[in-house]
């Protein structure tokens, strides 16, 4: 008998699909429809707020196509909780106008194919990687997102029997399969849940994305992979868009959901600000100018969310990458050890550009900078970075505006000269109105890689310096000593 890979299980999952009896709905008195909508919206909002649970996630989705009208997705710690939710919905007045079209029961799973060390030698797995795998078992549902759910199984035909293959061969194919999926990190988030012994097929796959074509693309590309092409068998696909329970009246009235806020275009066809979100890139100039942008709406969204975790985020001017930074009072060696574990996992993703620890030139603090190709990937990484030891509020928290000058990478022969120049500039800054604090942060792995962190009373005060002759002279001088052009980002 072939070996079975070990598995670990997390939350139980219920995908509950309903069709609406539109004839009965249209014929119902207005007061009955209003009462039914109020009842259902309250019920669904309570499920999303975990009014009757300690942990979990719930979401409401409109479904496009004839298979269903509504999809309710619930993650809970036990099957009993899902059973109670399903029966409780049937007690609502709204349920009189619906009929269950489909349901699917599963449990979130990770397997030894993708995480052998996690199972074989758990003590050797660093905390960052362990947190990553454990987060897979308790997934989040993005706020404003498209969804594609489908069940699948592995074939057991005489010439295509997945379960007869040696485990090493299966693991190798799954590794290639996983590498393909990683190309969509930051664009598509997935939840893999086992339904072996729980439902008709073997897994339930739930894909979330801001751009529905990203879901189409990942499924399309994976169809050509050997795991899917030879051994994959797929069930029906359910495709839709999440909307808040409060928009249920708009859904039943045939209006757009999610309902626009502040105008017809308030919700773009793929905008969201929740964790695991995505954002379009914008083009910059050639980097020679030194005016600065405070970022677009997506940038503002990620900054606002991460600020709650004492993580500061922004987009380097003229770049299509996103950066997050946090400050810690942990020792450099201890912090680096933690970050190195996280970085090992980050580097599995094509959207990862760089994660590094920087030590203060003057202040007794460290910074962790993580740079990604997409806002959503930076946002996701920040969730793990927030768990690093001794994360603190930024020094000079009384300021209303901060800057992080990134990638001042000097030519090795000019590094000492650059540090000396910084000390001179810091002296000028100390006398400037509205300036609170500035420090040079140096990469603990590369002395030539630095960024300057500043705190100002306001953006106007900071801009006064960046427009000054002193700064212009420094920029001119820097062209001769820097190995690459500097990147700047404002962090409000």
UniProtKB/Swiss-Prot annotation:
Q: Where are the residues of the annotated region Disordered?
A: 253-301
GO MF annotations in UniProt = heme binding; metal ion binding; oxidoreductase activity
Which SUPFAM superfamilies does this one have?
Answer: Dimeric alpha+beta barrel
Keyword Iron belongs to the record? yes
Any single Pfam family the record assigns to this protein: Chlor_dismutase
Q: Which residues form the ABM domain?
A: 402-490
Bias class Basic and acidic residues marks the residues at: 264-301
Q: Which residues hold heme?
A: 177
Q: Does the keyword Iron apply?
A: yes
- Alphabetical keyword list: Heme, Iron, Metal-binding
- Chain segments annotated as transmembrane: none
Q: Which PANTHER family match?
A: COPROHEME DECARBOXYLASE, HEME-DEPENDENT PEROXIDASE YWFI-RELATED
Protein family: In the N-terminal section; belongs to the ChdC family.
Q: What is this protein called?
A: Putative heme-binding protein VNG_2021C
Tell me which species this is from.
Answer: Halobacterium salinarum (strain ATCC 700922 / JCM 11081 / NRC-1) (Halobacterium halobium)
Task: Give the taxonomic lineage as stored in the record.
Answer: Archaea, Methanobacteriati, Methanobacteriota, Stenosarchaea group, Halobacteria
């Amino acid at each position: 008998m072939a070996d079975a890979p070990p598995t670990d299980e997390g939350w139980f999952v219920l995908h509950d699909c309903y069709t609406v009896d539109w004839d009965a709905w249209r014929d119902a008195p207005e007061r009955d429809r209003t009462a039914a909508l109020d009842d259902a919206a309250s019920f669904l909002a309570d499920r999303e707020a975990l009014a009757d649970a300690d942990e979990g996630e719930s979401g409401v989705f409109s479904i496009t196509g004839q298979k269903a009208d509504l999809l309710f997705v619930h993650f809970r710690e036990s099957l009993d909780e899902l059973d109670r939710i399903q029966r409780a919905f049937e007690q609502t007045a709204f349920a009189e106008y619906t009929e269950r079209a489909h349901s699917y029961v599963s449990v979130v799973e990770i397997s030894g194919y993708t995480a052998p060390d996690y199972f074989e030698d758990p003590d050797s797995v660093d905390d960052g990687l362990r947190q990553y795998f454990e987060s897979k078992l308790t997934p989040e549902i993005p706020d404003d997102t498209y969804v594609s759910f489908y069940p699948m199984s592995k074939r057991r035909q005489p010439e295509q029997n997945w379960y007869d293959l040696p485990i090493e061969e299966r693991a190798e194919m799954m590794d290639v399969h996983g590498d393909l999926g990683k190309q969509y990190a930051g664009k598509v988030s997935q939840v893999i849940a086992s339904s072996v012994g729980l439902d008709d097929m073997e897994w339930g796959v739930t894909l979330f994305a801001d751009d529905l074509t990203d879901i189409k693309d990942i499924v399309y590309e994976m169809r050509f992979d050997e795991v899917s092409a030879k051994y994959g068998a797929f069930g029906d696909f359910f495709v839709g868009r999440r909307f808040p329970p409060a928009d249920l009246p708009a859904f039943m009235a045939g209006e757009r959901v999610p309902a626009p806020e502040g105008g017809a275009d308030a919700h773009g066809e793929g905008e969201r600000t929740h964790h695991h979100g995505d954002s379009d890139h914008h083009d910059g100039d050639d980097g020679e100018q030194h005016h600065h942008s405070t970022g677009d709406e997506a940038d503002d969204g990620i900054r606002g969310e991460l600020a709650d975790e004492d993580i500061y985020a922004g987009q380097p001017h003229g770049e299509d990458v996103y950066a997050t930074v946090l400050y810690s009072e942990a020792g450099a060696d201890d912090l680096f050890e933690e970050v190195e574990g996280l970085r090992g996992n980050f580097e599995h993703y094509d959207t990862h550009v760089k994660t590094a620890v920087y030590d203060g030139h003057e202040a007794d603090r460290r910074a962790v900078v993580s740079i990604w190709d997409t806002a959503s990937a930076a946002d996701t990484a920040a969730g793990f970075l927030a768990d690093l030891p001794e994360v603190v509020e930024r020094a000079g928290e009384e300021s209303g505006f901060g800057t992080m000058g990134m990638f001042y990478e000097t030519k090795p022969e000019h590094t000492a000269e650059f540090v000396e120049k910084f000390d001179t500039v810091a002296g000028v800054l100390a006398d400037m109105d509205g300036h609170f604090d500035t420090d040079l942060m140096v990469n603990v792995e590369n002395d030539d890689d630095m960024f300057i962190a500043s705190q100002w009373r306001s953006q106007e005060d900071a801009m006064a310096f960046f427009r000054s002759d002193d700064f212009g002279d420094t920029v001119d001088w820097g062209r001769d000593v820097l190995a690459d052009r500097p990147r700047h980002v404002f962090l409000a």
